[in-house]
Amino acid sequence: MSKVVDLVRPVVETIIDEHGDMLVDMEYVKEKGQNYLRIYVDRQPNGIDIDEIAALSELVSEKLDTIDPDPLPDPYVLELSSPGAERPIKTEADWKRALNDYVHIGLYQKIDDKKVYEGTLKYYNNDEIVLEVKDKTRRKKLTIPRKLIAKIRFAIEF
């Protein structure tokens, strides 16, 4: 199904870029017998509003209908939305944006007897990250190998 995404991504990205927005992610999935093309869009620095999402959805829908040959020959539902405040960190741009931000991390194996951490991302490279975490009444820096990270996403600190 990613072949569909590969075919429509350039078209969708052009429309989104022309409006000063950013394509965060895109997926084409089948759920309960229904195909969905999901497009996640954001705007820096304050996020994207519902009116802009609606306008982009209309433009993307119209443009997708003109592509020949049709990369989406089966019926599908187009969903355009914001990725949300707690979106996954996937791309290099996401990693840059996450620097000095609060994140949630799930690990493949335990470090210091825990598989889940939340804290401020202080540093990253291809091999490891440094996370500042609360340890009772103080803060400490924890170095985590990237190969141990199962999931990482933005998080809201309470």
Swiss-Prot record:
HAMAP family the record matches: RimP
Keywords (A to Z) from UniProt: Cytoplasm, Ribosome biogenesis
GO cellular component: cytosol
Name by which UniProt lists this protein: Ribosome maturation factor RimP
Entry's family note: Belongs to the RimP family.
A GO BP annotation: ribosomal small subunit assembly
Coiled-coil blocks: none
Function statement: Required for maturation of 30S ribosomal subunits.
Pfam families per the UniProt record, alphabetical: DUF150_C (PF17384), RimP_N (PF02576)
Subcellular location: Cytoplasm
Top-level taxon in the UniProt lineage: Bacteria
